[in-house]
C-alpha cells in the first residue's frame, strides 16, 4: 500500500538516494536540514523522496528522486501532486533542473511552466556537472501555481 510520510528523524538514512537527485554532498547539506523531507512509501520501502523549502510566497522543490527500479511508473508525478496540496498555502511551487535534462519534460507534463534561469548555478558545485554529455552552467527554473 502506498502512503506519503513526512520524514522528521534520521534523514541521514536517505542521503544515498538524495544524492542521486543532487550529486554534490556540499550542496545537499545546504538544504537538507532546513527543508521538509517527504517520502512515498510502498509498505516500509521508500519509492520516492522529495525535499521542499518554503519561504515567502513560494515553496521550492530542492530535490526529488525515485528509486531506480520504480522510475517511469508515475511515482514522481504522484509526489508532485501531493506536494502541491501540502504546500497550497504558498502561491507557487518552484523547481530547478539542468538545461538538457529529461526532468524538463517531467515538470512540463506536471503543469510547471518555464520561469527563468539561475545563471552560473552549477559552477558552484565542487566538480563539473555533466548531463547528456554537456557541462551544465545555468539552472533552468520552472514554476507551478499551487495556491
Placement of each model-derived feature along the sequence:
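Conserved GNAT acetyl-CoA-binding A-motif
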Residues: 86-99
Amino acid at each position: 500500500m502506498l502512503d506519503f510520510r513526512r520524514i522528521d528523524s534520521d534523514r541521514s538514512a536517505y542521503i544515498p538516494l538524495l544524492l542521486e537527485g543532487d550529486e554534490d554532498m556540499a550542496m545537499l547539506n545546504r538544504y537538507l536540514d532546513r527543508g521538509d523531507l517527504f517520502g512515498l512509501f510502498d509498505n516500509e520501502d521508500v519509492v520516492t523522496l522529495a525535499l521542499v523549502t518554503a519561504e515567502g510566497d513560494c515553496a521550492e522543490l530542492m530535490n526529488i528522486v525515485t528509486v531506480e527500479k520504480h522510475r517511469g511508473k508515475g511515482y514522481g508525478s504522484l509526489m508532485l501532486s501531493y506536494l502541491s496540496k501540502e504546500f497550497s498555502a504558498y502561491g507557487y511551487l518552484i523547481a530547478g533542473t539542468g538545461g538538457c535534462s529529461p526532468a524538463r519534460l517531467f515538470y512540463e507534463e506536471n503543469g510547471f511552466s518555464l520561469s527563468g534561469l539561475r545563471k552560473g548555478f552549477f559552477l558552484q558545485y565542487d566538480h563539473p556537472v555533466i548531463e547528456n554529455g554537456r557541462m551544465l552552467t545555468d539552472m533552468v527554473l520552472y514554476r507551478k501555481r499551487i495556491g
